[in-house]
């Protein structure tokens, strides 16, 4: 009886332990030790071992599939078609779409760009511990040495406008290699400068050369990652320009403690030289052909299409009732377009994914009339498309039509017919104007050399200034305002640390002053890594809840914590120095400051890139322009402000400025979606292009 009972228990145990949900080759007994099975522990181990082996096998297979892309013609651009300067020297192939790179390769490119982005800010701060030595050797004043720092910062802010434009015309790789090769040469000049005037001039050129990555770097990250993964990787990239001002005084103090001040410049020569080699060998071209003007226009059009779905459906029904009459007008417009194509040949599709859709000097070969006609007919096509989908289609080439809505079919049909007639009339007038201005010839056979030189000069030097029009877009202007104010406080803090700790009652040597930047460097690093993940999580959560990606989702509790911490950190730092507290206590303020600054700057940078589809590098260039102007101002006014107001009250004023500026984040959070849906961003893009 006992044996039978035992067999019955075992049978029951087997029945309870079988897992029919597993595949046949993975079915195992998996029971608790209390069940009394002598093989349960062994089976648990076998099950876990099988799972681990399966996971490892899948991981290896996934990695092999990722690496196989490097040799696949489906992903890789042929060697003879690769873009950029010296593409044959790059060991990493160019992909047809930069977002198809394996994850580890994307990370490597991001960290390479982050390393490059350290060059500019490091060149500024590395001479902080050497200011007194430079003053002594050149027999000049501290103010003149500060001028060399200020002009460096100004050029670091102004020149990204041109570098970002060059990167969109010639590609990222060409821009990086050219700029850092120039930086290498100018750093040699700075190390050999015979007097303060030449030193100031060469420092300005160094700032201009190192400025490329300050704007193009964010564009490179946008090339590689979709919006949901962009915040985290932008934070990795932004470690470079934000950690450099904090780490470079440490390097500078170590160098000045052992060698003369010129060693700081020779250190920059070595660093920039290594960077040129790394960029040449490891950086492929990442500028996406998929981000052409046509693709960007499609994205913006889709945004506007989503705004008024219900009304659009009603209007489409009304338009259908009046189809016979309106088709006649549309056919007349289409006939004009056909005649134009017969006259000048086939016009490239504006939605082409070819990189040549970007403007370049080659497009200015005397075919100005043809280009103008292409623009007119492209705008006309877009207007017709908008009229078919939405009654609010307002075109750049036509007189603005009052936005009238009606549920009366006859009135709606009349409004649409009138709008289309205006479009037809304006189109005919503009075509006649272009043809008459060119004497009936669209493509003159010969173009003067002077005109070609002027066109090239315009594209590379004048046209980048048009990017200032982006400041007309409220989300861009507001985000840049807060980002610039936050960034300028970094230089107020850095200059104050060097100024106050080198004087009584502290009297620190340059080596120890450099080490004082460690607390905020640590919190910078922490906030950069986890802050980027935080903003990506917020964006994904918003998409899961509402089904769309909204840049405003990046501004949430992450920014609230930093806005609260920011003024507190400045007050602790300023008043502890003012009251001559123990040297450690002001560093509590700098540590908290590092977290607050990085969290806000990182979130606003991600927001800025997401707000300008396909123009992230240009947006970041504008951001750099404004923030570096304020940073240069901080360099010039910090010492007089500390002497005139006292450290405590000076940083109290800064705390209130930051607190007041944070109100723009509330405005962005509340009204960002309204501007995104109602502002015609495509018109702004057309104005810049």
Curated annotation (Swiss-Prot):
Topology feature Extracellular, residues: 1-108, 164-175, 257-265, 494-510, 578-586, 643-648
Residue positions, PTM Phosphoserine: 436
Annotated GO CC locations: cell periphery; plasma membrane
Subcellular location(s) of the protein: Cell membrane
Transmembrane segments: 109-131, 140-163, 176-193, 236-256, 266-283, 476-493, 511-532, 559-577, 587-609, 625-642, 649-668
UniProt cross-references to Pfam families, sorted A to Z: MFS_1
Keyword Membrane: yes
Any one biological process term the GO annotation gives: amino acid export across plasma membrane
Biased composition (Polar residues): 1-24
Region (Disordered) residue spans: 1-73
Miscellaneous remark of the record: Present with 279 molecules/cell in log phase SD medium.
Protein known as: Quinidine resistance protein 3
Naturally occurring in which organism (per UniProt): Saccharomyces cerevisiae (strain ATCC 204508 / S288c) (Baker's yeast)
């Amino acid at each position: 009886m006992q044996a039978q009972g035992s067999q019955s228990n075992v049978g029951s145990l087997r029945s309870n332990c079988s897992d029919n949900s597993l595949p046949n080759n993975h079915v195992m007994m998996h029971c608790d030790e209390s069940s009394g099975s002598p093989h349960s522990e062994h089976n648990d181990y076998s099950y876990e071992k099988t799972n681990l082996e399966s996971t490892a096998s899948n991981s290896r297979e996934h990695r092999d599939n990722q690496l196989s892309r490097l040799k696949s013609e489906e992903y890789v651009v042929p060697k003879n078609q690769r873009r950029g300067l010296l593409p044959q020297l790059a060991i990493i192939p160019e992909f047809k779409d930069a977002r198809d790179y394996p994850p580890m390769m994307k990370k490597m490119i991001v960290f390479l760009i982050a390393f490059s982005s350290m060059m500019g800010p490091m060149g500024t701060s590395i001479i902080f511990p050497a200011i007194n030595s430079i003053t002594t050797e050149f027999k000049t004043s501290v103010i003149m040495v500060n001028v060399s720092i200020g002009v460096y910062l100004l050029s670091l802010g102004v020149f990204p406008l041109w570098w970002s434009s060059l990167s969109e015309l010639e590609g990222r790789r060409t821009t990086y290699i050219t700029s850092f090769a120039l930086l290498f040469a100018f750093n040699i000049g700075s190390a050999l400068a015979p007097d303060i005037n030449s030193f100031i001039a060469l420092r300005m050129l160094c700032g201009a050369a190192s400025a490329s990555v300050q704007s193009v770097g964010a564009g490179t990250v946008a090339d590689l990652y979709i919006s949901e993964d962009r915040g985290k990787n932008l934070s990795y990239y932004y470690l470079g320009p934000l950690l450099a001002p904090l780490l470079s005084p440490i390097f500078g103090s170590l160098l000045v403690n052992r060698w003369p001040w010129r060693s700081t410049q020779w250190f920059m020569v070595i660093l920039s030289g290594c960077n040129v080699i790394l960029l040449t060998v490891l950086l492929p071209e990442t500028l996406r052909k998929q981000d052409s003007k046509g693709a960007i226009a499609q994205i913006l059009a889709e945004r506007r299409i989503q705004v008024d779905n219900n009304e659009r459906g009603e209007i489409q029904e009304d338009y259908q009732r009046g189809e016979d009459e309106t088709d006649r007008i549309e056919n007349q417009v289409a006939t004009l377009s056909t005649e134009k194509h017969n006259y000048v040949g086939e016009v490239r599709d504006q939605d082409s994914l070819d990189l040549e859709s970007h403007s370049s000097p080659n497009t200015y070969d005397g075919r100005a009339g043809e280009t103008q006609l292409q623009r007119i007919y492209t705008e006309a096509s877009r207007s017709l498309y908008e009229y078919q989908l939405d009654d609010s289609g307002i075109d750049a080439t036509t007189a603005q039509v009052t936005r009238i809505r009606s549920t009366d079919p006859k009135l709606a049909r009349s409004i649409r017919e009138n709008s289309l007639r205006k479009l037809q009339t304006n189109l005919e007038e503009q075509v006649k104007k272009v043809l008459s201005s060119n004497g009936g010839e669209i493509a003159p056979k010969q173009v003067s050399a002077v005109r070609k030189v002027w066109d090239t000069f315009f594209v590379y030097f004048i046209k980048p200034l048009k990017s200032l029009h982006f400041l007309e877009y409220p989300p861009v202007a507001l985000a840049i305002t807060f980002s610039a104010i936050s960034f300028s406080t970094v230089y107020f803090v850095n200059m104050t640390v060097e100024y106050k700790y080198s004087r009584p009652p502290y009297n620190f040597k340059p080596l120890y002053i450099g080490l004082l930047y460690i607390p905020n460097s640590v919190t910078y690093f922490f906030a950069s890594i986890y802050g980027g993940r935080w903003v990506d999580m917020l964006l994904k959560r918003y998409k899961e809840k509402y089904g769309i990606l909204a840049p405003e989702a990046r501004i949430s509790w992450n920014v609230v914590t930093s806005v609260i911490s920011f003024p507190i950190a400045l007050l602790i730092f300023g008043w502890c120095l003012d009251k001559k507290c123990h040297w450690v206590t002001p560093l509590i303020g700098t540590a908290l400051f590092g977290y607050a600054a990085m969290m806000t700057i990182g979130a606003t940078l991600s927001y800025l890139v997401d707000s300008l589809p396909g123009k992230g590098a240009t947006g970041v260039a504008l951001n750099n322009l404004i923030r570096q102007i304020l940073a240069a101002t901080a360099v010039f006014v910090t010492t007089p402000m500390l002497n005139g107001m006292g450290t405590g009250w000076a940083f109290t004023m800064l705390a209130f400025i930051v607190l007041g500026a944070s109100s723009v984040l509330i405005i962005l959070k509340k009204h960002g979606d309204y501007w995104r849906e109602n502002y015609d961003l495509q018109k702004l893009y057309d104005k810049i292009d």
